[in-house]
Curated annotation (Swiss-Prot):
Residues 303-314 have a biased composition (Low complexity). This is Ribosomal RNA small subunit methyltransferase A. InterPro entries: KsgA/Erm, rRNA_Ade_diMease-like_C, rRNA_Ade_Mease_Trfase_CS, rRNA_Ade_methylase_Trfase_N, rRNA_adenine_dimethylase, SAM-dependent_MTases_sf. The gene is rsmA. GO terms for cellular component: cytosol. Its main location: cytoplasm. It comes from Mycolicibacterium gilvum (strain PYR-GCK). SUPFAM superfamilies: S-adenosyl-L-methionine-dependent methyltransferases (SSF53335). Keywords: Cytoplasm, Methyltransferase, RNA-binding, rRNA processing, S-adenosyl-L-methionine, Transferase.
Length: 314
């Protein structure tokens, strides 16, 4: 028996059979086009050696395609009804492949390594629009074992993730995701391949983690770099000198730190690359603690203080 992918009629029939209605609060839009899920899986390059983390499997369209590639899949689903139904759907549309599936009923934003017994090597998902960026950044930080990411997100989010410094779409997500790896666009996806049909187009984005990170990857270092990014984009039209003035303690000190990092103080924050942010922090190592963007002005004393089919709902 070979794997049968889900079509539009099957998706709607399946939802009706379990009396399920998509919830906007969970960003539930299900892919019903076999060519689209094959395209996503092919672009991800996953194979039988991979352990794939899938976020928001929904009714199982992408899950089936991933299993068809021979990969082991851990599917994390926040909706208990869908999490309970998924193994049944996979078993009905495949054969022994269901034994390579684990389903966890969890919130992806609080999902952690201790929730899994084996670390994933890839992340492939149709991310819910409402949590796409936070979920992506959280998983990249929490699971350094993830080497490849292929996600489908709202087209606007895809543009932001892949944007280059200085462009109109370049912002916090663009810079932060590049802390972990290289980012590439993989085209658009029409709303017509979803049920219910969303009002916007979707985009595919692939992230390949750096084989050897150019900078430290510990949590403390990452958080400090991210704070600098937040500070810069909270005031993106200001010069870097002015944007970082409160963090540095004064405009002159800000300029000194920027120059030490080979950054022109007159450059705007929206032109700084991830390399610039990292270098700024490293050149400011003597000042180690980076205050949060929203309380930087109140921290003048900081310098002186120098994760067979199973469903788990646990």
């Amino acid at each position: 028996m070979t794997i049968r992918l889900l079509g539009r009629t099957e998706i709607r029939h399946l939802a009706k059979s379990i009396d399920f209605r998509p919830r906007k609060s969970f960003g539930q839009n299900f892919v019903h086009d076999a060519n689209t899920v094959r395209r996503i899986v092919s672009a991800s390059s996953v194979n039988r050696s991979d352990h794939v983390l899938e976020v928001g499997p929904g009714l199982g369209s992408l899950t089936l395609a991933l299993l068809d590639r021979g990969a082991r899949v851990t599917a994390v689903e926040i909706d208990p009804v869908l999490a309970t139904q998924l193994p049944t759907t996979i078993a009905a549309h495949s054969h022994s492949e269901v034994n390579r599936l684990t389903v966890l009923n969890r919130d992806i934003l609080t999902f952690k390594q201790s929730d899994m017994t084996e670390m994933p090597t890839a992340l492939v998902a149709n991310l819910p629009y409402n949590v796409a960026v936070p979920a992506l950044l959280h998983l990249l930080a929490e699971f350094p074992s993830i080497r490849t990411v292929m996600v489908m997100v709202q087209a606007e989010v895809a543009e932001r993730l892949a944007a280059e410094p200085g462009g109109k779409d370049y912002g916090v997500p663009s810079a932060k995701v590049r802390f972990f790896g290289n980012v590439r666009r993989y085209g658009m996806v029409s709303p017509t391949v979803f049920w219910p049909i969303p009002r916007v187009y979707s985009g595919l984005v692939r992230i390949d983690r750096y084989e050897t990170s150019p900078w430290p990857t510990d949590t403390e270092f990452q958080e400090q770099v991210f704070e600098l990014i937040d500070i810069a984009f909270a005031q993106r039209r200001k010069t870097s000198r002015n944007a970082f003035a409160e963090w540095a303690g004064s405009g002159n000190e800000s300029a000194s730190r920027l120059l030490a990092a080979s950054i022109d103080p007159s450059r705007r924050g929206e032109t700084l690359s991830i390399n610039d942010f990292v270098r700024l922090l490293q050149r400011s190592a003597d000042w180690h603690t980076v205050p949060k963007a929203d309380d930087a002005g109140d921290d003048a004393d900081a310098q002186a203080k120098a994760d067979g089919a199973q469903v788990s709902t646990l």
